[in-house]
C-alpha cells in the first residue's frame, strides 16, 4: 500500500493515515516543534498529488487533508469522530443552519454605523442592525459593510474561533474576510446564473467610481468579477462543498508566522476535520473519482486569491486617483491587509 501523503511505500497507519516513515516523522516534527512553512505557489504544489510534495507547506497541508492528527477537537460542531454517517450528516446540517441564519441577517438588515474590524471583533453589537424596508437605501457601501459583517459573524459563531487570542483573531479575519465574501457572492451568482458578482437587488459589487476610473476598460472589472464564478460553473460546486470549502480556507494556520502555538494548533486540527469531511462528501457522491474531485475543489483557492488581489489593487488605485472617495472603515481595514 502506498503512503497517502507522498505515494511512497507505506509502513503503517500513523497518526490516523497510512503513511511512510518519512512522512510520519515529518508530521511529528512539524506539530511538536510548532514549525510554520509558507508555500510560494499559493498552495498549488501538490494539486495533482502525483509527485512527492517537496514544498514543506504543501506536504504538511496534505498530511492534514488525509486525516493525520495529534490533537483532539474541542468544538461540538466539528467533532465528527470516526466520520460516522450520523455525525457527518449532523455536521452538514449544522453548517447549513448556521449559513441560512447568517444569510437571512445579511439580506434583511442594514446598519448606519461605521466601525473598524477591531471594533466588530470586540463587540458585534456595535453594528446596531436595523430591519430593512422597501425604502432602505440600496447602495454598494451598505451591502459591502453588511457582507463583511455577516462573514465575521458567521465565523465568530464557532467557539474555537471566538476564543482565539485577539491579535491572532484580527490577523485571521483581516486576511480571510475578503476571500470569504468573494466566495459567498460567487456562490450566489452561480445559484442565480449571473455572470458577475452582485449584491442583492442587482447592486454591482464595484462602486460606480471604479467604473469611471477604468473608463472604456471595464473588461478588467468584468474579468475580476467573473473569474471565481467561472470556476463555480466549471466545477458545479454544491452547497455542501461550498460550506466546507470556506472553512478549510479560513482555518489556515500558515497565513502568519506570528500566530501563537495555541492558535496554530486550533486552526490545524479544525482544518483537518473540515478537510476530512469534504473528502468524505466526495467519496459518497463521486465514488472512485473522489480524489480528483477533492483536488479540483481545492484549486478554487488559487482563483480566489488572485481575484481578491486584483480587487485590492483596484481599490487602492481608486483611493489614490480619487482622494475624496472613502470606503467604510472596515473595508479600509480589509484593503490595507499587509499580508496581500
From Swiss-Prot:
Location, primary (coarse class): nucleus
NR C4-type Zn finger ranges: 3-23, 39-58
Signal peptide: none
Disulfide-bonded cysteines: none
Gene3D superfamilies: Erythroid Transcription Factor GATA-1, subunit A, Retinoid X Receptor
Superkingdom of origin: Eukaryota
GO cellular component: a single term: nucleus
Stated family: Belongs to the nuclear hormone receptor family.
Source organism per UniProt: Caenorhabditis elegans
Matches recorded under SUPFAM superfamilies: Glucocorticoid receptor-like (DNA-binding domain), Nuclear receptor ligand-binding domain
Positions of the DNA-binding region: 1-75
Family matches, as Pfam families: Hormone_recep, zf-C4
Domain named NR LBD: residues: 98-337
Protein name: Nuclear hormone receptor family member nhr-197
GO terms of molecular function: DNA-binding transcription factor activity; RNA polymerase II cis-regulatory region sequence-specific DNA binding; zinc ion binding
Amino acid at each position: 500500500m502506498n503512503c497517502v501523503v507522498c505515494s511512497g511505500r507505506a509502513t503503517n497507519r500513523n497518526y490516523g493515515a497510512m503513511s511512510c516513515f518519512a512522512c510520519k516523522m515529518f508530521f511529528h516534527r512539524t506539530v511538536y516543534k510548532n514549525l510554520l512553512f509558507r508555500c510560494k505557489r499559493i498552495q498549488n504544489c501538490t494539486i495533482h498529488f502525483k509527485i512527492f510534495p517537496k514544498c514543506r507547506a504543501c506536504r504538511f497541508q496534505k498530511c492534514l487533508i488525509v486525516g493525520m492528527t495529534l490533537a483532539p477537537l474541542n468544538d461540538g460542531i466539528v467533532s465528527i469522530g470516526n466520520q460516522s454517517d450520523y455525525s457527518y450528516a449532523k455536521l452538514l446540517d449544522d453548517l447549513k443552519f448556521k449559513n441560512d441564519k447568517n444569510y437571512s441577517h445579511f439580506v434583511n438588515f442594514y446598519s448606519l454605523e461605521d466601525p473598524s474590524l477591531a471594533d466588530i471583533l470586540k463587540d458585534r453589537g456595535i453594528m446596531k442592525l436595523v430591519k430593512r424596508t422597501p425604502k432602505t437605501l440600496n447602495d454598494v457601501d451598505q451591502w459591502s459593510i453588511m457582507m463583511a459583517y455577516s462573514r465575521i459573524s458567521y465565523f465568530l459563531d464557532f467557539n474555537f474561533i471566538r476564543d482565539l487570542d485577539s491579535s491572532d483573531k484580527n490577523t485571521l479575519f483581516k486576511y480571510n474576510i475578503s476571500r470569504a465574501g468573494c466566495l459567498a457572492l460567487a456562490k450566489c451568482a452561480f445559484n442565480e446564473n449571473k455572470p458577475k458578482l452582485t449584491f442583492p437587488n442587482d447592486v454591482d459589487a464595484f462602486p460606480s467610481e471604479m467604473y469611471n476610473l477604468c473608463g472604456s476598460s471595464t473588461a478588467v472589472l468584468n474579468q475580476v468579477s467573473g473569474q471565481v464564478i467561472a470556476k463555480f460553473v466549471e466545477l458545479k460546486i454544491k452547497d455542501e462543498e461550498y460550506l466546507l470549502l470556506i472553512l478549510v480556507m479560513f482555518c489556515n494556520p500558515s497565513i502568519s508566522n506570528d500566530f501563537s502555538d495555541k492558535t496554530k494548533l486550533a486552526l490545524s486540527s479544525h482544518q483537518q476535520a473540515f478537510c476530512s469531511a469534504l473528502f468524505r462528501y466526495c467519496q459518497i457522491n463521486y465514488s472512485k473519482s473522489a480524489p480528483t474531485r477533492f483536488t479540483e475543489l481545492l484549486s478554487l483557492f488559487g482563483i480566489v486569491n488572485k481575484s481578491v488581489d486584483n480587487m485590492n489593487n483596484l481599490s487602492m488605485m481608486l483611493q489614490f486617483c480619487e482622494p475624496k472617495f472613502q470606503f467604510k472603515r472596515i473595508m479600509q481595514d480589509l484593503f490595507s491587509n499587509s499580508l496581500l
